[in-house]
């Protein structure tokens, strides 16, 4: 039986806190049952890219964080999910673009969409807290 493939949506896979957390999990899961693939938002190779490939993961590169072309990003995401119906789980770690990639994943019938916040700085303002509450209600 093929492993379940979980698409991790991240800025890049350099050696920051978020990336180390994901890699610690990835190294210790049963990869015959669950595999992580990565949708990154920079073209430049990341610190963990070689290890990801060695562990059986795939890396898909988008450039929206470099070219700031949101229209192109939306088109690329639609094409991506059309070409990759194997993803039944999208685990997003990017609040800034989450409203785009989660809505497109939903449109393409990805049944499980996990929003993971790695910080609480957005809770320091009333606007940020209201946004947080709104996301919790959806």
Enumerate the predicted regions with their spans.
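Membrane-interface segments of envelope glycosyltransferases acting on lipid-linked substrates or membrane lipids
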Residues: 1-138
């Amino acid at each position: 039986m093929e492993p379940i493939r979980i698409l991790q949506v991240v800025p890049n896979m350099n050696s920051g806190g978020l990336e180390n957390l994901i890699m610690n999990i990835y190294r210790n899961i049963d990869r015959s049952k669950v595999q992580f693939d990565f949708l990154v938002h920079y073209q430049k190779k990341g610190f963990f890219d070689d290890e990801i490939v060695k562990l059986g993961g795939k890396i898909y590169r988008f450039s929206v964080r470099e070219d700031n072309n949101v229209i192109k990003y939306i088109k690329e995401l639609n094409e991506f999910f059309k070409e990759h119906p194997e993803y039944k789980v999208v685990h997003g770690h990017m609040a800034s673009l989450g409203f785009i990639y989660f809505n497109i994943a939903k449109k393409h019938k990805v049944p499980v969409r996990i929003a993971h916040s790695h910080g609480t700085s957005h809770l320091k303002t009333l606007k940020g807290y209201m946004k947080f509450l709104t996301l919790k209600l959806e």
